Amino acid sequence: MENNKSGTILVVEDEPGVRDVAVQMLEFAGFDVIEAVDAASGLQRFKENPQIDLVFTDVIMPGGTSGIEMSKEILVQNPHILILLATGYLDKAEALIDKAAHSSNIAGVAKPYDINIIPDLISSMISSASAEPL
């Protein structure tokens, strides 16, 4: 894993330990990282930070709003935002991923994910999006 990545990532994860690892992994790789502890704070951080390139979110979170519901709201605000869904229940994310199958801006990863792969996947998503015409 190289530490020469660039971009701003919003990490939305309710489990403090998982969130800390994700943030450290992405910062070490060179990304700027904004944290949120649930979908409500994720939506707020997204509205406050228009420079966000990608939302890396857990799918299942307490508090009523799931990562999928939050992602749908974010996509209404910015249809070009990149979203990486992380879940131990990948079938829960399949509906949104299937719906966006013709779009390169949504992907899913199974938990536990490999911390050596995620930064490269995110960098690849950002590079691909910046190469595509809007």
Model-found features: residue ranges?
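Active-site residues of response regulator receiver
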Residues: D58-V59
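Two-component/phosphorelay signaling modules centered on CheY-like receiver
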Residues: P16-I34, I106, M125
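Non-catalytic signal-transmission and effector/linker regions of two-component phosphorelay proteins
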Residues: M1-L10, P16, L75-V76, H80, ...
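Acidic catalytic/metal-coordinating carboxylates
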Residues: D38-S41, G63-M70
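Acidic, metal-coordinating helix/loop segments flanking the phosphotransfer/catalytic sites
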Residues: V23, E35-L54
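A Lys-centered signature of the CheY-like receiver
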Residues: V109-K111
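Hydrophobic/aromatic residues positioned on beta-strands within the core alpha/beta folds
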Residues: A86-G88
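His-Asp phosphorelay/catalytic-motif detector in bacterial-type signaling
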Residues: Q51-D53, V76-L84
